[in-house]
Amino acid sequence: MFITTKKSLIALVLATAGLISSPVSFATETGAQPNLGATLTQLTQQYPIHWISIEQVAESLKGKAPISVGFDIDDTLLFSSPAFFYGKQKFSPDSNAFLKNQKFWDAVSSSGWDRFSIPKDSGRALMELHLKRGDHVYFITGRPMPSNGKEDLTQTLKDDFKIPDNQLNKVIFAGTKQDAKVEYMQKYHITIFYGDSDNDIQDARKAGAEGIRVLRPLNSTNKPMPKNGAFGEKVIVNSQY
């Protein structure tokens, strides 16, 4: 009887010791792989960004007279990476030298390449808002003007965004120089300018306009990605598509 009881106690001690030392018995972090997973703090981390919806933009303009608004084009209204990707493969596969090649700009803006660009849903919603209000809409792009003076980007935008003839303004090709868009924003008295790049926001402020950020699509070929809200500007929610 004593021997049986002693054996039982020994078995209990051994079982308990095994339970304590077992790596699968209790929740531990020892088996986690480095750089995988996230803590709850990381999952719920928020950045101090002034998010705004298109509905809120509409509400802020309610009851106001028509204004002049400006739009950047690439990654703001159009997901144009397909055209830029093709241009890179054609003119400089191993570098971004194609962006300084006038032949590329001639091709992308006057040879129908933008028919392969995808109009963004957020762009369509913003365009519909401003056209319904009777606002004057201007397209100011950082692309250089085609050397032959002919472009088909205006027609592409007209078709993609269903812009009536009496509300259509031709695309302004501001070019790539520093602050290139500022003079056109001032010339056309732009009140709000929508763009995806830091330069868009900064140019708008230099021109006395409000720059509102539109999110650049994650799969854009235009890298590096900007830091949205970096200047305290309003950022359109869900505008990456």
From Swiss-Prot:
Main location: periplasm
Known catalytic reactions: a phosphate monoester + H2O = an alcohol + phosphate
Cofactors demanded by this protein: Mg(2+)
CDD domains named in the record: HAD_CBAP (cd07499)
InterPro entries the UniProt entry points to: Acid_phosphat_B-like (IPR005519), HAD-like_sf (IPR036412), HAD-SF_ppase_IIIB_AphA (IPR010025), HAD_sf (IPR023214)
Residues holding Mg(2+): 72, 74, 196
Positions of substrate binding: 141-142, 181
Signal sequence extent: 1-27
Cofactor: binding details: Binds 1 Mg(2+) ion per subunit.
Active site: 72, 74
Keyword Magnesium recorded: yes
Cell compartments where the protein resides: Periplasm
Subunit composition and interactions: Homotetramer.
Role this protein plays: Dephosphorylates several organic phosphate monoesters. Also has a phosphotransferase activity catalyzing the transfer of low-energy phosphate groups from organic phosphate monoesters to free hydroxyl groups of various organic compounds.
Family to which the UniProt record says this protein belongs: Belongs to the class B bacterial acid phosphatase family.
Protein name: Class B acid phosphatase
Species the sequence originates in: Edwardsiella ictaluri (strain 93-146)
